[in-house]
Curated annotation (Swiss-Prot):
Family from the record: Belongs to the Nudix hydrolase family. DIPP subfamily.
Natural source organism: Homo sapiens (Human)
Name of protein: Diphosphoinositol polyphosphate phosphohydrolase 3-beta
One GO process term, biological-process aspect: diphosphoinositol polyphosphate metabolic process
Positions of short motif Nudix box: 50-71
Keyword terms of this UniProt record: Cytoplasm, Hydrolase, Magnesium, Manganese, Metal-binding
Gene assigned in the entry: NUDT11
């Protein structure tokens, strides 16, 4: 566990930062997804999510993060997958599906850092995310294709006779 000025970072036994995120959909059809502006690069879009707090369950962390970053409440659905990122940072992110039931007019990150949110068709969101956050595009590709992620490593169990 490491402390940042405004949060505590938690790590799993393998040294991965524990994160949670949600693909927030306008309806159960899952054809329009909500993205938020990056705090670091306000002209770029990302999937809302962030670090898990000590003793916090992944689903609870995902709901808290989308409330803080996107100003939405909703019905938490299935766990889409657990994605690892090893390139620039060691992250392990639990990604859930959430159907939005309420959009707040003002929310924590809109007031404090001017964060924006916008609905995208899934295909458009994938294109937007591939430039800046390819691992986030991967979440939607897995959802759309029902397959395994390609850039990060999915933590789906593999059979003993598969190639490493």
């Amino acid at each position: 566990m490491k402390c940042k000025p405004n949060q505590t970072r938690t790590y799993d036994p393998e040294g991965f930062k524990k994160r949670a995120a949600c693909l927030c959909f306008r309806s159960e059809r899952e054809d329009e997804v909500l993205l938020v502006s990056s705090s670091r690069y306000p002209d770029r879009w990302i999937v809302p999510g962030g670090g898990m707090e000590p003793e916090e369950e992944p689903g609870g962390a995902a709901v808290r993060e989308v409330y803080e970053e996107a100003g939405v409440k909703g019905k938490l659905g299935r766990l889409l997958g657990v994605f690892e990122q090893n390139q620039d940072r060691k992250h392990r992110t639990y990604v859930y599906v959430l159907t939005v039931t309420e959009l707040l007019e003002d929310w924590e990150d809109s007031v404090s850092i001017g964060r924006k949110r916008e609905w995208f068709k899934v295909e458009d969101a994938i294109k937007v995310l591939q430039c800046h956050k390819p691992v986030h595009a991967e979440y939607l590709e897995k959802l759309k294709l029902g397959g395994s992620p390609t850039n990060g490593n999915s933590m789906a169990p593999s059979s003993p006779d598969s190639d490493p």
